[in-house]
Design a protein with these regions (language model features):
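Small-residue-rich helix-loop
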Residues: 1-127
Length: 127
């Protein structure tokens, strides 16, 4: 983790996707006897729902429609950066966590692809 400023606006700031996924995984862990799980669990409730609330209300059409109502995620958009990190319930009822980050000249064009990737996790049958 590299934090050059307190706002997250510096191009030198860097937070690895794995850190975001690890935080989400700890929050979603089934064992609530873990103190960190109990402390982080409220974070999941506040995540926007695909096609329904917050920054995801107008998203998840077309190829990503399968994620509507299933994907819960926080979006992040800055100049040249687009991210989506959250949870999705897969076809077998497991909670999966994900953190997708893109860095390029046109983050808006990447947004539907991030949505489609998160929605694809819904149909995952990992057994």
């Amino acid at each position: 983790v590299t934090l050059m400023d307190g706002s997250g606006l510096s191009v030198q700031d860097a937070v690895p996707a794995m850190l975001l996924a690890d935080l989400l995984s700890a929050a979603a862990a089934p064992d609530e006897s873990q103190r960190r799980t109990t402390a982080l669990r409220p974070m999941l409730v506040g995540l926007p729902v695909a096609g329904s609330s917050g920054t995801l209300a107008e998203r998840y059409d077309g190829p990503a429609a399968g994620g509507r109502g299933w994907v819960r995620a926080k979006t992040g958009t800055l100049t040249g950066v687009n991210s989506l990190a959250g949870t999705v319930l897969d076809a077998e009822g497991r909670v999966l966590v994900f953190a997708l980050l893109s860095n390029g000249p046109n983050p808006v064009s990447v947004r539907p692809r991030l949505d489609a990737l998160a929605a694809a996790l819904r149909s995952c049958g990992c057994h």
